[in-house]
C-alpha cells in the first residue's frame, strides 16, 4: 500500500522495530542520519523532502535516555524547519514515566517536563504504549494515543493454553491491579495481588509482604508494565513458588532490564518471561528464559488509522 503523504523515520533507539513497522505498512523508512560530535552534541540530517507530509518519528526513550530524548527534540525541530505538515512521535517506551508525581518534598515531576519539551519542540501528536502512569496523558495539550500491550500478551498465553481457572494472573503490586484485571479478563482467570512495601531509601528495591488471593496449585502469570532491575518481579515469583504455585510465568511491556536484571531472572522461579519489543534487546540479552514478541503490527495499524483519521478503539481488543 502506498502512502504518498506519509513518512516514517527511525532514530537510534529501536531501528529494528521501525523496520518491522515500515514493512508491515508496505513503505520504506525515511532517509536520515544521526551523528554525535566528539563532545557528545547530536546532529540530525533529513536526506529527503518532507514538505507537506505527515511525518511519524519512531523512537523509544530508553537507555541512553537523555540522548534518545534529545534526538527526538532535534529531529522535530529539523522537520518543522523543513515544512512538515504534521509531526507525530511514536514513543513505544516513554522514559521518565516513573517521575509522574512528587513522592517527597522538593522533587520534580519530570514526566510533565518531558511533555512540555515535546510540545514546545513542535510535536502534534504522541503515540505510546503502556505508560507507567496513565495520567501522564493529561500532562499533554496535544492528542495522546495510548496503546495497550495486554492483548498481545494475552494472545501469547492463550496460544500456549494458559487460560481458565487453573491459572491466576498476579499483579506484583497494588498499582498494577487494573493491568492484571485486564489480562485476567482476556484469559478468563482469577487474579491475585502481591502486597509489597518499597524502600524509601533504595531505588529499585521492594519487599514482598503478603499474597492476596489463592495461588496454591495454580499456574501464575505475573504482569507489569516494565521490568528494570527485575528485583520486584523476581521476589514476587519466588514468593508465589513458596506459596505453592506449580509454575510461574512473567510478562511485561517494557524490558528495561538494567543492572543485575538478567542474573536476577536467571536465578528466580520464573520459567518464562514474555516481553514486547518496545525496547531493543540485542541477541546476547535474550537469555533462554526471555521470549520477545513484536508490537510492529499493532503500531503499524495505529499509524495507518491515525493518518487516515480512523478510530483506534478496535486495537484494544484481544486478537486484533
Curated annotation (Swiss-Prot):
InterPro entries: PRib_PP_synth_CS, Pribosyltran_N, PRibTrfase_dom, PRTase-like, Rib-P_diPkinase, Rib-P_diPkinase_bac. It catalyses: D-ribose 5-phosphate + ATP = 5-phospho-alpha-D-ribose 1-diphosphate + AMP + H(+). Keywords: ATP-binding, Cytoplasm, Kinase, Magnesium, Metal-binding, Nucleotide biosynthesis, Nucleotide-binding, Transferase. The active site is at 196. It comes from Streptococcus pyogenes serotype M1. Mg(2+) 2 binds at residue 173. It is found in: Cytoplasm. Pathway: Metabolic intermediate biosynthesis; 5-phospho-alpha-D-ribose 1-diphosphate biosynthesis; 5-phospho-alpha-D-ribose 1-diphosphate from D-ribose 5-phosphate (route I): step 1/1. It is an enzyme of class 2 (transferase). This is Ribose-phosphate pyrophosphokinase 1. Belongs to the ribose-phosphate pyrophosphokinase family. Class I subfamily. Mg(2+) 1 binds at residue 132. HAMAP family: RibP_PPkinase_B. Its cofactor is Mg(2+). Its EC number is 2.7.6.1. D-ribose 5-phosphate binds at residues 198, 224, 228-232. GO terms for molecular function: ATP binding; kinase activity; magnesium ion binding; ribose phosphate diphosphokinase activity. Binds 2 Mg(2+) ions per subunit. It comes from the Bacteria. The gene is prs1.
Amino acid at each position: 500500500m502506498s502512502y504518498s503523504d506519509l513518512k516514517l523515520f527511525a532514530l537510534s533507539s529501536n531501528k529494528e522495530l521501525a523496520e518491522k513497522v515500515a514493512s508491515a505498512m508496505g513503505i520504506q523508512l525515511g532517509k536520515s542520519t544521526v551523528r554525535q560530535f566528539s563532545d557528545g552534541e547530536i546532529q540530525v540530517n533529513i536526506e529527503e523532502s518532507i514538505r507537506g507530509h505527515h511525518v511519524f518519528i519512531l523512537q523509544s526513550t530508553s537507555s541512553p535516555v537523555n540522548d534518545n530524548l534529545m534526538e527526538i527534540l532535534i529531529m522535530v525541530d529539523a522537520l518543522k524547519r523543513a515544512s512538515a505538515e504534521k509531526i507525530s512521535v511514536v514513543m513505544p517506551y516513554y522514559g521518565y514515566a516513573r517521575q509522574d508525581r512528587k513522592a517527597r518534598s522538593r522533587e520534580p515531576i519530570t514526566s510533565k517536563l518531558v511533555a512540555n519539551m515535546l510540545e514546545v519542540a513542535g510535536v502534534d501528536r504522541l503515540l505510546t504504549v503502556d505508560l507507567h502512569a496513565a495520567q501522564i496523558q493529561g500532562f499533554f495539550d496535544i492528542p495522546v494515543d495510548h496503546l495497550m500491550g495486554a492483548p498481545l500478551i494475552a494472545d501469547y498465553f492463550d496460544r500456549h493454553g494458559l487460560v481458565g481457572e487453573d491459572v491466576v494472573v498476579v499483579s506484583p503490586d497494588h498499582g498494577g491491579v487494573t493491568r492484571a484485571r485486564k489480562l485476567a479478563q482476556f484469559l478468563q482467570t482469577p487474579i491475585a495481588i502481591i502486597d509489597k512495601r518499597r524502600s524509601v531509601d533504595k531505588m529499585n528495591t521492594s519487599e514482598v509482604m503478603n499474597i492476596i488471593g489463592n495461588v496454591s496449585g495454580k499456574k501464575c502469570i505475573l504482569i507489569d508494565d516494565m521490568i528494570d532491575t527485575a528485583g520486584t518481579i523476581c521476589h514476587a515469583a519466588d514468593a508465589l513458588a513458596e506459596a505453592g504455585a506449580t509454575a510461574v510465568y512473567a510478562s511485561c511491556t517494557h524490558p528495561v532490564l538494567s543492572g543485575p536484571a538478567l542474573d536476577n531472572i536467571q536465578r528466580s522461579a520464573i520459567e518464562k518471561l514474555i516481553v514486547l519489543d518496545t525496547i531493543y534487546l540485542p541477541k546476547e540479552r535474550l537469555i533462554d528464559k526471555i521470549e520477545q514478541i513484536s508490537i510492529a503490527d499493532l503500531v503499524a495499524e495505529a499509524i495507518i488509522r491515525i493518518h487516515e483519521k480512523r478510530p483506534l478503539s478496535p486495537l484494544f481488543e484481544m486478537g486484533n
